[in-house]
Amino acid sequence: GGQLLETLPIPVLAAAVAGMGHVDVELDPDGIARSVYLRAGLNSPYWPTLALALLELDSAHPAARQALPGQRAVTSPVPSYAWRRDYRVLLPFAGPPGHFPHFSYNDVLRDRIAPAAFRNKYVLVGSTATGMNDALPTPVSGLARPMSGVEYNANVFDALRQGLTIRELPPNWSLLLTGVFTLLPMA
């Protein structure tokens, strides 16, 4: 029950990186991860999600220069120690766990993977070993085979890079369509 703190990397690492981002994922009430907040931070949502930070490094890519998609957060006064999120987007997952190519770090270090496998590619590094990663249940994996955090972030990056995010229907439209589909079998 202590105060939430934002901890930056040690200075030598912080000085060496081209950008920093958050990897905060909120599960929906049913325990499934379907979305991401593109910006988050203490008292102000200023950190981009890791995938957005990566995309912003590629200033030549059109998606890096577009306005952020997503549902805006309601602004209200909050304590300075509150975690704030903004620009929520639903994700169109590219596929189930294992959809993106992945390589063992050990195999890469031992030159067992051809350099061509990485040429002109965006590369995310993370743990996928059972019990050593942040496994997330997703709509394409469910609870039986959770998706690794690095693959979840690859899906976020892929969706942003392609400009593909899912928008939620406004509540009034959702209610109307529910009514229409409920009455449809009676017609």
Give the residues covered by each predicted segment.
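Protease-associated
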Residues: 73-115
